[in-house]
């Protein structure tokens, strides 16, 4: 049964202001709206708050890989699974800074530093704060994902120059325990609160395609949209195949239309948030990515690798955005010479 499109009349104007009281029925009604109407609504809201022809870019570096004590069932960096990832020590600041310089030269406006920890130790946080200050001095936006934080740790990160803290909720509260047992959803919410109270912007989203139902995907969006403040960035990750992890047994990557619907609903429910196409873009055709941009996605990660998984080449991204007539920090990236016809 198809739902009637959600109207934009004066009694239910989705564009009036961000809401924090979304219901399951409203989310399901949006999701099942006829596809052309859903994209029209999402694009209308997108145009109210963003340049619809611009895409932000960010780069992600694993500054400490593997050996994580958490048992996230999708993650190659968990010490619980044999995913072929070798644990490393925390990188030196100079190496991180050089990578950030290259990312900036390649067109990244934001540099994200990720460490596979349950929570950072204070001695490690000292070094991370030095990295953040150095990257900030390059003129880039800074982001970090380091696990759970105390209020004091969040404050220190903010004082070091951190702009965004990434801490995903991963999935719906109902599906969460099927994926992770060593960290609760409440743990995640408390870390988000610590980051927000310290004055950090939030980057918070999740993963789709782990075996969850559509209702779980919508439940994740409802959770995010009903926070006191919407995350400034909402990354939508498409499940990446990772050997040796339990999610392989349940994974069911959504069909392209389902992904576009998810992006559109995220845009409508969180109208001022940047919606990022994150991990999994290597599985998307150019046409699918274009539809996601129409639905309201307006950010991508660039670089050949995201932590331990593959990502489209930056030149491919630049070429796609050029074909679509969309602007981005990649505009200055040199295109490969065209093949002779």
From Swiss-Prot:
Protein name listed in UniProt: Biotin synthase
Keyword presence, Mitochondrion: no
PROSITE patterns (UniProt xref): RADICAL_SAM
Assembly and oligomerization: Homodimer.
Keyword 4Fe-4S: yes
SS bonds (residue pairs): none
Protein source organism: Nitrobacter winogradskyi (strain ATCC 25391 / DSM 10237 / CIP 104748 / NCIMB 11846 / Nb-255)
Pfam family, one: BATS
Reaction(s) catalysed by this chain's protein: (4R,5S)-dethiobiotin + (sulfur carrier)-SH + 2 reduced [2Fe-2S]-[ferredoxin] + 2 S-adenosyl-L-methionine = (sulfur carrier)-H + biotin + 2 5'-deoxyadenosine + 2 L-methionine + 2 oxidized [2Fe-2S]-[ferredoxin]
GO terms for biological process, alphabetical: biotin biosynthetic process
Keyword tags: 2Fe-2S, 4Fe-4S, Biotin biosynthesis, Iron, Iron-sulfur, Metal-binding, S-adenosyl-L-methionine, Transferase
Record family assignment: Belongs to the radical SAM superfamily. Biotin synthase family.
Domain named Radical SAM core: residues: 53-272
Summary of the function given for this chain in its UniProt record: Catalyzes the conversion of dethiobiotin (DTB) to biotin by the insertion of a sulfur atom into dethiobiotin via a radical-based mechanism.
Stretches of the chain forming a coiled coil according to its record: none
NCBIfam families (UniProt xref): bioB (TIGR00433)
Record-linked SMART domains: BATS (SM00876), Elp3 (SM00729)
Note accompanying the cofactor annotation: Binds 1 [4Fe-4S] cluster. The cluster is coordinated with 3 cysteines and an exchangeable S-adenosyl-L-methionine. Binds 1 [2Fe-2S] cluster. The cluster is coordinated with 3 cysteines and 1 arginine.
